[in-house]
Amino acid sequence: MIEGLLGRKIGMTQVFDATGQVIPVTIIEVGPCVVTQIRTKERDGYEAVQIGYQEVKAKSLTRPEQGHLRGAGKLLRHLREFRADNIADHKVGDVLTVEMFTPGQRVDVIGTSKGRGFQGVVKRHGFGGGPRTHGQSDRLRAPGSIGAGTDPGHVLKNTRMAGRMGNQRVTVQNLTVVDVVPERNLLLVRGSIPGAKNGLVMVRRAIKGS
């Protein structure tokens, strides 16, 4: 069995358990994914199953990409590789669905965080800023010292500064599957996941167990 699938973030909502407690959940459209290539140790040096997600028209892909996907029988926008318990269980063209997940199972969700652009240290790192009163004029959100008192003077290593924030790969681990809706390819997981709506995500079995 392959360890994960591709999907897209739909959004957040809430459901109620048997006792009436509110559970915040994220809805993910998972699959259907198509096996596009089998990586073998003899040919590639490692074992993995490559899958594709989200059908597109031919004009959206280059000719080499179209040739690569010819064996799968479908033109797909996103390709990713996952490990599998036994790659012999899969062959090119197989369709994988959300039914591989079950309620109560723990999963890891990998996505790309929202890009925030160039941000200061207060927003990017949670700095407290300078004093608000007693003559302070322009140090409200400044980073403060970045190495004063060093000899020779230099900026200390790993000093947190302003810079580009977000748009990075983020993994959220051990989220609980609340419900699976196979007829609509939907997976409901407890809590939030990284990224914007419609963003590509990878959902895999939790690597740290339940």
Curated annotation (Swiss-Prot):
GO terms for molecular function: rRNA binding; structural constituent of ribosome. PROSITE patterns: RIBOSOMAL_L3. Residues 125-151 are annotated as: Disordered. Gene3D superfamilies: 3.30.160.810, Translation factors. One of its GO terms (cellular component) is cytosolic large ribosomal subunit. GO terms for biological process: translation. Pfam families: Ribosomal_L3 (PF00297). Keywords: Ribonucleoprotein, Ribosomal protein, RNA-binding, rRNA-binding. The keyword Ribosomal protein applies. InterPro entries: Ribosomal_uL3 (IPR000597), Ribosomal_uL3_bac/org-type (IPR019927), Ribosomal_uL3_CS (IPR019926), Transl_B-barrel_sf (IPR009000). Part of the 50S ribosomal subunit. Forms a cluster with proteins L14 and L19. Belongs to the universal ribosomal protein uL3 family. One of the primary rRNA binding proteins, it binds directly near the 3'-end of the 23S rRNA, where it nucleates assembly of the 50S subunit. This is Large ribosomal subunit protein uL3. The lineage of its organism: Bacteria, Bacillati, Chloroflexota, Chloroflexia, Chloroflexales. The gene is rplC.
